Design a protein with these regions (language model features):
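Negatively charged
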Residues: 1-197
Length: 197
């Protein structure tokens, strides 16, 4: 069972040649795996759906190349450990090809990194993106960065996204207003669930 997989505690898995791998979907689903794999070549991977869902993985994978990726659906859902190894480098991910980010950080209670730089212009589904997250585990500062960053990325219109009960502040109000604003007035018509201001 993958639930106990941790490569026998050896970091040697970091040396795997992954340059031709196309899918890493479900790879460490519900696994106790937590080895450094930040050096993996993910440049051809198109699917990372549920890759670390329900796992205890918490390593820095901020240098991964996601440029060919289209699915990060539930990638870290129910992973209560993941915070990119404490590094904000995940903000540098090229997610410009991703179309489905539904449940990506749902119930991911440790994740608290900025992702406002992500190019989310091709995402068509954000359903339950950060459902059940709170200000105890995601900062208003980082939510402000999402609102102010993503509102400049020309995202798809009419999307629904859930940030649990995370609050934003006046610093994020302008960005949120653009995302939720009417498409007739230059907004994107999003329906956003958050904890208010």
């Amino acid at each position: 069972s993958s639930s106990s997989f941790n490569n026998e505690g050896s970091p040697s898995i970091s040396g795997w040649t992954t340059s031709n791998v196309l899918s890493m979907a479900n790879m460490f689903l519900i696994a106790s795996f937590n080895q450094p794999i930040g050096s993996w070549d993910t440049s051809k991977v198109t699917n990372m759906q549920q890759m670390f869902a329900g796992a205890v993985f918490n390593q820095n994978i901020g240098n991964w190349d996601l440029s060919k990726n289209t699915f990060t659906l539930a990638m870290f859902s129910n992973n209560t450990s993941f915070n990119n190894g404490g590094s904000s480098s995940i903000n540098n991910w090229n997610v410009s090809g991703v179309t489905n980010m539904s449940q990506m950080f749902a119930n991911a209670t440790s994740f608290n990194q900025p992702i406002g730089s992500w190019n989310v212009s091709n995402v068509t589904s954000f359903d339950l993106f950060m459902v059940n997250k709170t200000n105890l585990n995601y900062s208003s500062t980082n939510l402000n960065l999402i609102y102010n960053g993503w509102s400049t990325k020309n995202p798809k219109t009419g999307l629904t996204i859930n940030f649990g009960s995370i609050k934003y502040t006046s610093e994020g109000s302008a960005g949120k207003a653009i995302l939720t604003g009417s498409t007739l007035s230059g907004g994107y018509g999003w329906t956003i669930t958050d904890g208010g201001i």
